[in-house]
Swiss-Prot record:
Main location, first listed in the record: cytoplasm
Residues given in the record as Mg(2+) 1 binding sites: E93, N531
Catalytic residues identified in the record: H49, H95
Subunit description: Monomer. Part of the FGAM synthase complex composed of 1 PurL, 1 PurQ and 2 PurS subunits.
Pathway: Purine metabolism; IMP biosynthesis via de novo pathway; 5-amino-1-(5-phospho-D-ribosyl)imidazole from N(2)-formyl-N(1)-(5-phospho-D-ribosyl)glycinamide: step 1/2
Source organism superkingdom: Bacteria
GO MF term list: ATP binding; magnesium ion binding; phosphoribosylformylglycinamidine synthase activity
CDD domains: PurL_repeat1, PurL_repeat2
EC number: 6.3.5.3
Organism: Azorhizobium caulinodans (strain ATCC 43989 / DSM 5975 / JCM 20966 / LMG 6465 / NBRC 14845 / NCIMB 13405 / ORS 571)
Alphabetical GO biological process terms: 'de novo' IMP biosynthetic process
Similarity section: Belongs to the FGAMS family.
Keywords: ATP-binding, Cytoplasm, Ligase, Magnesium, Metal-binding, Nucleotide-binding, Purine biosynthesis
Protein name as catalogued: Phosphoribosylformylglycinamidine synthase subunit PurL
């Protein structure tokens, strides 16, 4: 009989985030009342963050296979073949709740956690990205949270030595009480040297590696599976503390130990720490696990079994060592100044047994904790469709020129240079395109291949129509990769939503996942990894549905990558794709008209594929000189961004009869790109487009120092640049 103190009360169960019926299910499973350590273990393994119990049923519907896919969802990261015996290993993951409570450490350890997911697979990290969402800029907390998160990301990534090469930042009042910090890491590995989490072989040593265990982060995973109330600030002790220099040592030691042939299975200690890593290794390998916590290296005295099992101290790994390799593995880790301790063994019992001070603190069935955790088909209601806005439904109170200046200096569309200048985006020396373009481009070793990387989502669209919003997030990632000349190969997703127990929120989740699946299927763009973050609510107010897509593309020859800047005066400007002037749920409507209504633009996936393949062909043929996808803000914002990047003006027109100029210039119709080419190639451009069945329209030509439009005052490029570049530094510099 396992001694059972303290006794388990309904209040204690509720504090651990378990519903009464879940607790009852657990009691029936083990046939007795659990110990406090067992309650802690099951609360960690069965919470939303670790078990995906509300989302699993829908995640299974996503397309996850493809000719390049080596490993899809279910491991620490996705693995995709890029040829020449190499694979790209990548994943995106949220650290939303910790970053709201303690922004510097929360964001920093989010970066650390996702880097570990990548190098656990045997890959050396080569790039990091992020997608950040903050509240209304006027909210008293927003500036402090933004400063802390950006400093935390930069502090960890820069110290670890990985370039942060891209990302996105957005603002909306719906994030006032729950910011989003989605971190993505990308690494390179040899295709025949990928390492997995599933334990193999009975009686093998289970080894603890890395930094010592402390009391930081206990119940971090449980906190990440709950709504916030007014006491959110008091949860600061549940936020982990990171040490990027220890993580750098851990990376080098892990890669060396892998090369030495010592590793049977490896898992990083992330959410729920030792509990989750040990259970996952055993459950995936159909083996039992027995741990002796007296062997765990601790940095604090008197730690209980409960605390050791649930600590989320950072920079730690769990490994199953090949027979007879213990001494060799230990020598490698000691060389790097890291802890190495044999803390258990694999068994054939399918039990998860935890001992401390000679007592059994937990004895549980391992499969039911891990891959057989509860699963819910939660009831949902579909988001009611919004009406389509016609040209007469929008009152254009300002000129096109004034609207452009307002958009370009708005919080969502302004330059994020203030953010990315705090990140080292050039370390390792392989960054070809730095932040500020459509996608980051990072050389693969010495080249000629390169990877293109992006993070994308338009929460406004997902709120208005989750299915179309999910499709659009994937389509925009696909366009951004295409615009730099890459062939899109795979995605990772980070699905951020409110409380799934509310049918309308679950409906948003289901709609977005269906949209993501439809787009990934149509665009041959499989989902290979990802993360779900639910309960992003404070006092009952949920975030905008935010299914962030991290896209990865492959460029065969980095010399052929494309940028968005205008290159020379006198070149022809074309828009590829059809312009209908769609203003519903647009940035123009939100920023200039102070409205958030109307159906978002529909995403025609056949047109996306056709138009994108056409543009990629133009880039490969060296036919065009610049390319930029059209997204937030529409056509004129895209042209302005190209003009500002190249410091060259443009003379443009082309508004069709009967369409308001504001609709033409600021509508957010999908599947569009702006491209430039030598003026003498304009007729050939039209011929190529007709042959491909792609609509194109000539808009004008580059040149001068201003953007000129019919019936509008000229807009000077340098003035636009000043507006674009100054909003964020001025905002962050204000008291």
């Amino acid at each position: 009989m396992i001694p059972n103190t303290p006794s388990i009360t309904p209040e204690l169960v509720a504090e651990h985030g378990l519903k009464p019926d879940e607790y009852q299910r657990f009691v029936e499973l083990i046939g007795r009342e659990p110990t406090i350590t067992e309650l802690g273990i099951v609360s960690a393994m069965w919470n939303e963050h670790c078990s995906y119990k509300s989302s699993k049923v829908w995640l299974r519907t996503l397309p996850t296979k493809g000719p390049r896919v080596i490993q899809g969802p279910g491991e620490n990261a996705g693995v995709v073949d890029i040829g020449d015996g190499l694979a790209v290993v990548f994943k995106m993951e949220s650290h939303n709740h910790p970053s709201f409570i303690e922004p510097y450490q929360g964001a920093g350890t989010g970066v650390g956690g996702i880097l570990r997911d990548v190098f656990t697979m045997g890959a050396r990290p080569i790039a990091a990205l992020n997608a950040l969402r903050f509240g209304d800029p006027h909210h008293p907390r927003t500036r402090r949270l933004l400063a802390g998160v950006v400093a935390g990301i930069g502090g960890y990534g820069n110290s670890f030595g990985v370039p942060t090469v891209g990302g996105s930042v957005g603002f909306h009042e719906r994030y006032n009480g729950n910011i989003l910090v989605n971190a993505m890491a990308v690494g390179l590995a040899k295709t025949d040297e990928i390492f997995y989490a599933a334990a193999a072989g009975v009686g093998r040593s289970i080894v603890y590696l890395g930094s010592k265990t402390g009391r930081d982060g206990i119940h971090g995973a449980t906190m990440a599976s709950a709504e916030f109330g007014a006491d959110a600030e008091e949860k600061r002790p549940t936020v982990q503390v990171g040490d990027p220099f220890a993580e750098k040592l851990l990376l080098e030691a892990c890669l060396e130990i892998m090369q030495a042939g010592c590793v049977v299975a490896i898992q990083d200690m992330g959410a729920a720490g030792l509990t989750c890593s040990a259970v996952e290794m055993g459950a995936k390998g159909d083996l039992g696990v027995e741990l002796d916590l007296n062997a765990v290296p601790c940095r604090e005295t008197g730690m209980t079994a409960y605390e050791m099992m649930l600590s989320e101290s950072q920079e730690r790994m769990l490994m199953v060592i090949a027979d007879g390799k213990e001494d060799q593995a230990e020598a490698i880790f000691r060389k790097w100044g890291l802890d190495f301790a044999i803390i258990g063994k694999t068994t054939d019992t399918l039990r998860f047994v935890v001992k401390h001070d000679g007592d059994v603190k937990a004895d549980l069935p391992i499969k039911e904790l891990g891959d057989e955790a509860p699963e819910y088909y939660r009831p949902f209601t579909e988001t009611p469709p919004r009406p389509v806005l016609g040209p007469s439904d929008v009152n254009h109170a300002v000129s096109v020129a004034d609207a452009l200046e307002r958009l370009i200096a708005s919080p969502d569309l302004c330059s994020k240079r203030w953010v990315w200048e705090q990140y080292d985006h050039l370390i390792l020396g392989n960054t070809v395109q730095r932040p500020g373009g459509d996608a980051a481009v990072v050389r693969v070793n010495e080249g000629p291949k390169a990877l293109a990387l992006t993070t994308d989502v338009t929460p406004r669209y997902c709120e208005a129509d989750p299915f179309e919003g999910g499709k659009q997030a994937v389509a925009e990632a696909w366009r951004n990769l295409t615009a730099v000349g890459a062939t899109p190969i795979a995605v990772t997703d980070n699905l951020n939503f409110g409380n799934p127990e509310k049918p309308e929120i679950m409906g948003q989740f289901v709609g977005c996942v269906k949209g993501i699946g439809a787009a990934c299927e149509a665009l041959d763009f499989p989902v290979v990894s990802g993360n779900v973050s639910l309960y992003n609510e404070t006092n009952g107010q949920g975030i905008l549905p935010t299914p962030t897509i991290g896209g990865v593309g492959l460029i065969d020859d980095v010399e052929q990558s494309m940028t968005l800047a205008f290159k020379a005066a006198g070149e022809a400007i074309f828009v590829v794709g059809k312009t209908d002037g769609w203003l519903g749920s647009s940035a123009y409507l939100y920023t200039v008209c102070d409205r958030e209504d109307g159906a978002p633009p529909p995403v025609d996936l056949v047109a996306e594929k056709r138009n994108g393949d056409f543009v990629r062909g133009l880039i490969k043929d060296d036919f065009i000189t610049a390319a930029h996808d059209v997204s937030d803000g529409g056509l004129l914002v895209a042209i302005a961004e190209m003009a500002m990047a190249g410091r060259i003006g443009a003379s443009v027109d082309g508004v069709p009869a009967g369409m308001p100029a504001h609709s033409f210039w600021f509508g957010e119709d999908q599947a569009r790109y702006v491209v430039t080419l030598p003026a003498n190639q304009a007729a050939e451009m039209v011929r190529r487009a007709e042959a491909a069945g792609v609509p194109v329209t000539k808009l004008g030509k580059t040149g001068g120092d201003k953007i000129t439009l019919a019936n509008e005052r000229p807009i000077f490029v340098e003035g636009l640049r000043d507006r674009h570049d100054s909003w964020l530094p001025i905002y962050m510099g204000a008291n």
